[in-house]
Amino acid sequence: MNEAVTIRGKERYKSGVMEYKKMGYWEPDYEPKDTDVIALFRVTPQDGVDPIEAAAAVAGESSTATWTVVWTDRLTAAEKYRAKCYRVDPVPNSPGQYFAYIAYDLDLFEPGSISNLTASIIGNVFGFKPLKALRLEDMRLPIAYVKTFQGPATGIVVERERMDKFGRPLLGATVKPKLGLSGRNYGRVVYEALKGGLDFTKDDENINSQPFMHWRERFQYCMEAVNKAQAQTGEIKGTYLNVTAATMEDMYERAEYAKELGSIIVMIDLVIGYTAIQSMAKWARKNDMILHLHRAGHSTYTRQRNHGVSFRVIAKWMRLAGVDHIHAGTVVGKLEGDPATTKGYYDICREDFNPMTLENGLFFDQNWASLNKLMPVASGGIHAGQMHQLLHLLGEDVVLQFGGGTIGHPMGIAAGATANRVALEAMILARNEGRDYLHEGPEILAKAAQTCTPLKAALDTWKNVTFNYESTDTPDYAPTPSVSV
């Protein structure tokens, strides 16, 4: 099964149809070079299709192959440019599925272009008939390729300096309801939340420029709220102004206006596409702005474990592309997030080097070559009563966004913000004192609530509310003595 079967010489270029594994796309003896891009695919062949042939077909169709032999291959350095599948393993506990390791020569990709990379890696091959399903699980991006990208426009260190916030997670909230508010009422929500103790507020993914609130009106009221809250609290505040629009010209216009109004941060949605994301990241770097990315739409291709693209790959692409914030899961919230898998996402965002960690879904070592770090964002169904869990699981370099957990507070928005700020600072103090804050968390919160009525109301309202559903995306690996959960 693992023997090389490549046909070489004149027979290799004889007209007609030839199996991919015989065309040079299956090379089990190949040793990947340090400069190779490596992709790990989960391949589910159609019934009766040889898994080696299926994996070789993925290599071929994502690089130089077509359905028949073409003599023009001989006009190229074909041996170099063919992607090479060098390893195929059965997926543990998933009959009929296989992990295929495929190496691509670096010269196959345009430097610094996510769009070009994805056109090959997740292009036509995902519609290939011999496959029931195909998922891109992970990638190893060589240093030589990583260095062609800008990376996060601002980075965690500079963002903290700009915000003058150190030693704790940043706090935020998404304005609710996400649609329907007038500009004046929208700005009021922003002001109350920032005045109450949050660092950021945020537009939601689908608030752009609708009949009930034009984008310019929203920007004006929001920045009036930010400036007023800053003056009252003496702290630097921000609000993510969503500049997502129909064209790049519109997005640049909105971003420039946000900058003119004094905003330190703008926001875009993942659905604008890779080229637009990189374009906005370059604008943000040039204009000293923090760039927040809402991952709107990602679950259409990241959530199912047998088909699509893993979010760990999206996180890698977005760190290359140059965003400063990305929603990366909450573990304890309402949105998809297996704890081990989510830790892998956070490590991709925040570490200079990611070692292979199979239990967290990281299949390769990844060196980030001094690219800035990307701030992960946790949002969706979290509240003050989970603060000890959030700090333990996600660390301090994270934005914790309590939308409903702020705006849904029974005493009002400002009280909701205060409850979250007091809960966080109580937990940070306990951590700094060396206490076992994870296990003592409820006790720490209860004590803090004795002198903070808003926190007591939050704990009484949401109690132990959580969303314990089984994750659809968990790591697949075979446990060994050196790799155990």
From Swiss-Prot:
This is Ribulose bisphosphate carboxylase large chain. One of its GO terms (biological process) is reductive pentose-phosphate cycle. The keyword Ribosomal protein does not apply. Heterohexadecamer of 8 large chains and 8 small chains. CDD domains: RuBisCO_large_I. Substrate binds at residues 124, 174, 178, 295, 327, 379. Signal peptide: none annotated. Binds 1 Mg(2+) ion per subunit. It comes from Rhodopseudomonas palustris (strain TIE-1). InterPro entries: RuBisCO (IPR033966), RuBisCo_large_chain_AS (IPR020878), RuBisCO_lsu_C (IPR000685), RuBisCO_lsu_C_sf (IPR036376), RuBisCO_lsu_fd_N (IPR017443), RuBisCO_lsu_N_sf (IPR036422), RuBisCO_lsuI (IPR020888).
